[in-house]
Amino acid sequence: MKKVRAIVSLLLALTLALSLTACGGQANSEPEQPETQEEQTAAEINLYVLSGPTGIGAMNLWAASDAGETKNTYHITMPGANDEVVAALSKGDADIAAVATNLAATLYNKTDGGVTVLAVNTLGVLSLLSNGQEAATVSELKGKTIYAPGQGANPEYILRYVLSGNGLDPDKDVTLRFVGEGSELLTVWQSDPEAVILAPQPVATSILMQNENAKTLFDMTEEWDKIAGGDSTLMMGCVIVRNEFLQANPGAVELFLQEYAASIEKARSDVEGTAVLCEQYGLIPKAALAQKAIPSCGLTFVTGAEMKTGLSGYLQVMFDANPKSVGGALPGDDFYYGA
């Protein structure tokens, strides 16, 4: 019996010792830290970016995300056409997308206000090129044939606006011929060496690099500004968000804007490095071409009231040219994030 009591006493002593040790450890441990604000708000984001200038601003973000250096986790897709972006946003496969500004307005109308524009990322990227011919003013293009991409989209309406602002009737004083893709412009002069070409970046840079006779006649951004006189700004590209995603993840959207702004700034300051990424991710075929084109790609980051003022004026011009260009109606004030 004494032996049993001794064993019981020993067990009780051990239990008490362990309890005291546990209590002591708990008292000395640091309280569990709450998640930081960034950790609480970060999210996985399905980001769609179109090829060309609209997508250049996302290249450094893409690389940073792949390296695990971003707060949000980005799954980036680069579709081949606007229709794929529209479908992805409609189905909820895309959360945020970099698109043309008139497409953003069209989506706003098609979805009954279901998307919001977060920032403008691209200004003017269009130039009128000739195969050696000279022209001092746009009005001197009367009688010329002008080849252009983007029928029914930004390029056509910008071209019409600039021609009309210089006293030319786009349907009578010049011959407009549209091509399906900007890359098709590379072969135009083989069949029509006297033609003038409306080329976006990086196609314009590629043409100038490959054809020693090619020259830039007019920068369309400069010509737009001469006509608009400050009433509107040529804003061709933007990033939009599905409102369902925005409402569910407001903090993640704010983080995106911070990380995206940094990506654009790096694209402007580190052109060579960004050009390498453009080739790596398949945005532009060759880094050498991208490096020459990026400084002319109108990269910017405009938000809030400044974005609303410039973009609403631009969309007004598009609407006046053809209401269908922006989806039949101008977007409401709720279209503009933070304005």
Model segments located where?
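Conserved C-terminal helix/tail region of periplasmic/extracytoplasmic solute-binding proteins
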Residues: 312-339
